[in-house]
Amino acid sequence: MDFDEILHHVGDSGRFQICMIILLNILSLVLSPHDVLENFTAAIPAHHCSINLDNSRSEVSTDMNLTTEDLMKVSIPMGPNQKPEQCRRFRYTQWQFLDSNISTFNSTELETEPCLDGWTYDHSVFTSTIVTEWDLVCDFQSFKYYAQATSLAGHLVSCPLSGIISDRFGRKPLLMYCSLAYGAVGTYCAFAPNFSVYCVLRFLLSAFQSTILINSLILVLEEASVQWHPTIIVLSGLFNSIGQGVLGGLAYVISDWHLLQLAYALPFFIFFVLFCWVPESVRWLIITGKTDQAWKELQRIASINGKKGIAQNLTTEDLRSKLKKDVNSTGKLFRIKDIFINPLIRKIVLSNSSLLFAELFSFVGLLLDVQLLGKNMFLTQIFLGAIDVPSKSLTYFTIRNVSRRPLIAFLLLTTGSCITITIFISEEMYVLRTIIFILGKGCFAAFTCISTTYINELSPVELRSTLNGVFLAVVRLAGVLSALTLATRKYFVYLPMILYGVLPIVATISILFLPETFNLPHTDIIKDMEKRKRLMSKNISKKEGQDFLETTEC
């Protein structure tokens, strides 16, 4: 009796699995906004230098009734866009600007200075953000993007570590303690005393977020029937997108960054309690030899699924038999360096990494700063989340009917073109800019689904998890560098957009070095990949080709 048969006896698609899927989707809904939360908690409102009139330097007494508009006129110079300068003020108060008899002044020749007394912020949209709290504007504006890069670096560190810890100690303990830690650290983050502490806490939160998302998905998949796996993955992806859309509406209601951070941190104390109830992965328990505990967990699952009587007939000997079978079927373990020894694998890793890096680099940066996309950032965030639903749904059908290489090339070219076109559209035409960005976001969402499928089709079973780890590291690195690229706006305002637009277009060349996998059998070992390559180039005998098709899975 193998594990799938054992799981079928206690129920592999019953009430327990439904509860687990619901829990996973709620987790996805709450966790998915983590990386884009700083679109709102770190939003940059309109601002100008604080006005501090110094009578000792003034030529006119200030004992008069002056409106805010008058004070701005005599204290803040106008910028090239005929709006008040955000980072400079007049060195001396220019009282002559109040004289209605004088029509024009050339304010560009007047002496200015930085904002020595701080800034005044427009609180009409956001009552508080980390930008207003720690004055992350002007010369310090790049600190916002450094904070985002630091946060994304938490994912880069946690992905390999969480996998090792999870395989060593189990899924459940990691989910329990990371949920508790996310709630505690997230709550403290909402009241961080300074910017440095805030960055460290966001780094930790990202590490916990990745760990929870990855291990919760693994736990649910390991406890469910294989036929449920596509549905589970698609639902998780859709709730990810819905969660990002919900963030736009929630941020509109909660305009204080402290409260918004708390709103996403406090639910994890509830998740901690729920994970205390969730059984450990039976599959992991069997593989690690904990058959007695696995038997107890199977009894719980059977009871929830209404099959308690059937489960009573299951003995620990059945589980030990399954364990023995798994141990005997274990083959050679591959190391990371083995990927780069084989030229075929090496070419796949390098080419596919360039595609993933380009696409993720181009759009992650934009998702981290939706203020670039249009005037109403709340609606933009909602639309960016909503567009994923039809996009990912449509992708399900294109995967079944369209070749991989031309589809991926089309998505890369469209994404890069959408970003590049917006450079030439003025900010006043924000509706058109938003529509084009949403089209690009739809292509990005489709790319994430199709690339996941393509990676699994390219990778042999014996190397699949290792290659996925390599590609995941590339994706996280792209996110970190994408956030840092936003800081280059202070040198040339269009530089991030140029890089985001050009890179996917250039990276399309890499698709030429990858094989087509549509309607071809999946491979189990590297030798199967080499046979598949020869089959496509017709450099293989008829008998070898027939053997290959018979011995590989479709």
Swiss-Prot record:
Q: Which UniProt keywords apply?
A: Cell membrane, Glycoprotein, Ion transport, Membrane, Transmembrane, Transmembrane helix, Transport
Where does the UniProt entry place glycosylation sites? 39, 194
Tell me which parts of the chain lie in the Cytoplasmic compartment. Answer: 1-15, 166-172, 221-231, 280-347, 398-405, 456-466, 513-554
Q: Can you tell me what the entry says about the temperature dependence of activity?
A: High activity at 37 degrees Celsius. Little or no activity at 0 degrees Celsius.
Topology feature Extracellular, residues = 37-144, 194-199, 253-258, 369-376, 427-434, 488-491
Among InterPro entries, the record links this protein to:
MFS, MFS_dom, MFS_trans_sf, Sugar_transporter_CS
CDD domains (UniProt xref): MFS_OAT (cd17374)
Q: Where in the cell is it found?
A: Basolateral cell membrane
Residues spanning the membrane: 16-36, 145-165, 173-193, 200-220, 232-252, 259-279, 348-368, 377-397, 406-426, 435-455, 467-487, 492-512
Its predominant location is membrane
Per its database record, what is this protein's job? Sodium-independent organic anion transporter which exhibits high specificity for a subset of prostaglandins including prostaglandin E2 (PGE2), prostaglandin E1 (PGE1), prostaglandin F2-alpha (PGF2-alpha) and prostaglandin D2 (PGD2).
Official protein name in the record: Solute carrier family 22 member 22
Gene for this chain = Slc22a22
